[in-house]
């Protein structure tokens, strides 16, 4: 465990995400992040500043979350036809009655990725598929469980590979 003190001139430095048992993402004002990264380096700890456009998953995004919620308020959401696991709550999601609030909360709330994976593993989930560009989450799943059947889909080629792997 590490403890880092940063200068109090920065208003916000939060620990919003637990990606895996050995990795925590800090978020907040850019200057506070820079100072924390420097402090970790002084301690001989690895710290990498992520290239992100905003302080997602922190209260700094509350205004954007409210605006987003208003924009999607009239969208006709439907409950999925399969189990849906939430990294907002770290468990299976059963209540789909207020999806605008749920989705807006993702913008300014911590991500409980390890809790979500633990819940999925406990439920007997055996395959994990990441949709979209890149393989960040696929890699994190494999670090969480080295034997996990984790794959990503970002185009027609990777879709074919994933379907073949899922069919066995």
Q: Would you name each region that the model predicts?
A:
Residues 105-168:
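Flexible, low-complexity segments
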Residues 1-110, 163-166:
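Alpha/beta catalytic cores of group-transfer enzymes, especially the acyltransferase/condensing modules
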